[in-house]
Swiss-Prot record:
Key word Repeat present: yes
UniProt organism field: Danio rerio (Zebrafish)
GO biological process, alphabetically ordered: regulation of actin cytoskeleton organization; TOR signaling; TORC2 signaling
UniProt protein name: Target of rapamycin complex subunit lst8
Function of the molecule: Subunit of both mTORC1 and mTORC2, which regulates cell growth and survival in response to nutrient and hormonal signals. mTORC1 is activated in response to growth factors or amino acids. In response to nutrients, mTORC1 is recruited to the lysosome membrane and promotes protein, lipid and nucleotide synthesis by phosphorylating several substrates, such as ribosomal protein S6 kinase (RPS6KB1 and RPS6KB2) and EIF4EBP1 (4E-BP1).
Keyword annotations: Cytoplasm, Lysosome, Membrane, Repeat, WD repeat
Amino acid sequence: MNVNQGTVGSDPVILATAGYDHTVRFWQAHSGICTRTVQHQDSQVNSLEVTPDRSMIAAAGYQHIRMYDLNSNNPNPVINYDGVSKNITSVGFHEDGRWMYTGGEDCMARIWDLRSRNLQCQRIFQVNAPINCVCLHPNQAELIVGDQSGVIHIWDLKTDHNEQLIPEPDVSVNSVHIDPDASYMAAVNSSGNCYVWNLAGGMGDEVTQLIPKTKIPAHKRYSLRCKFSPDSTLLATCSADQTCKIWRTSNFSLMTELSIKSNNPGETSRGWMWDCAFSGDSQYIVTASSDNLARLWCVETGEIKREYSGHQKAVVCLAFNDSVLG
């Protein structure tokens, strides 16, 4: 990504943010200009994800997922998925766009067939606590589910078998992620800790084996999100402590701390860092925070390159896709 250069015509960079003001905003990443605002009337937006073909964006909220068209200015959702009783906290897609997965506070992870005209979910994985996060293994065959009781579930979609991990009993798992190389899995929780495992197996019919690698005392307050960089060399953790920290995966040492803390002693907290996403070249990261802003940072220097201002309430999720399809 080049932060100083735009493109003529269709922008290959998709940057969308959403949160508690019931809007999804689309931005020109390099300039900070808001190019489109979609009213998401029903509820706050908890999670955003762009479809693999970059044609639509999914917004997960209370009891529903709304799909908006990225290639037109149609203000209305083009597809609605309903029938979930509580908040949907996580949404994502199979790499070929065949199905969508969600997790929610109704204690269920779901698989939705996107090729079917029937907008019902096809498979359900029930756990014993509200689900905060779901991520798909790069092998496209296992879903990792984190819940509020502190359990991480590995759901094998081929066999329906599942394994459980409990890094800290009764401490809510808020985010899980696997790096693109499928070398590591990270999870962060409400005590601020980040757990990292080495991955083995997971190819063919083999179930992924998780070997504990390290525990990072990443934050002193809730840790809300963890994301590996596309080149698998970095891990970002976001927290209620107003920081996003970037760790090197070579030794899990701290490389950069991105902070929205005020230098003014009289100013109260600017709020939580809720979400983050790396650029395709792993050199930049976008963060979403409850001071109503998203920011673009240089990973190496920690310098803020752009601020995206326009939301009226907390920004809690974002989608950032600057990969150009071949």
